[in-house]
Design a protein with these regions (language model features):
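Short linear sequence motif anchored by a di-proline
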Residues: 1-174
Length: 174
């Protein structure tokens, strides 16, 4: 039987991953490996900084975690998603994701969610490249696309500013 685990698949692209990487929004600069339309792996910052952002806005977007998620239902209507969905789509390879569950005392308990029969799967995303106008520094960043939660995830992701959401998990055909 051929090994088809995440380590094998990532080795095909000569990418080395840490044994365990946990990424939670609002914590120190998480980065992920992203597959963009060119089938090329890139390391990008999670939390989109739109290419049109002024330097002071770029810092605020990063600091306040404003663009971590984009609703699939509004991709074609809202800025900055509408300028990215056609040419700046990406695939975010993951082994799982965290979702918060609001307890009766208002605190959040995080659940790590995986797929039953796949140790590596993909989440849909959008990406952009921002260039600092004075220094020329380039920042590649991305946002996860979210959709309405399925029945299981509704029980978990039940509160906060965007309840009943989950990442848009791609099928192998997509």
């Amino acid at each position: 039987r051929q090994d088809t685990g995440p380590g094998r698949r990532m080795s095909l692209y000569d990418v080395r991953l840490a044994e365990e990487i946990y990424v939670i929004p609002a914590y120190a600069e998480p980065h992920c490996v992203i597959v963009s339309g060119s089938e090329e792996l890139q390391v990008m910052q999670w939390g989109l900084i739109p290419r049109t952002a002024k330097p002071e806005d770029a810092q605020r977007y990063d600091r306040e975690n404003l663009f971590k998620n984009a609703r699939a239902e509004t991709l074609f209507e809202k800025w900055p998603w509408r300028m990215l969905w056609q040419h700046n789509r990406c695939i975010i390879p993951v082994t799982g994701f965290f979702e918060p569950h609001r307890l009766s005392n208002g605190k959040a308990q995080y659940y790590y969610t995986t797929l039953k029969d796949q140790d590596l799967f993909s989440i849909a995303g959008l990406w952009d490249e921002w260039t600092h106008p004075q220094s020329g520094e380039k920042v590649l960043s991305f946002v996860l696309i979210t959709t309405e939660a399925n029945a299981m995830m509704r029980k978990i992701h039940n509160g906060g500013g965007n309840p009943f959401r989950m990442p848009k998990i791609l099928t192998s055909e997509q």
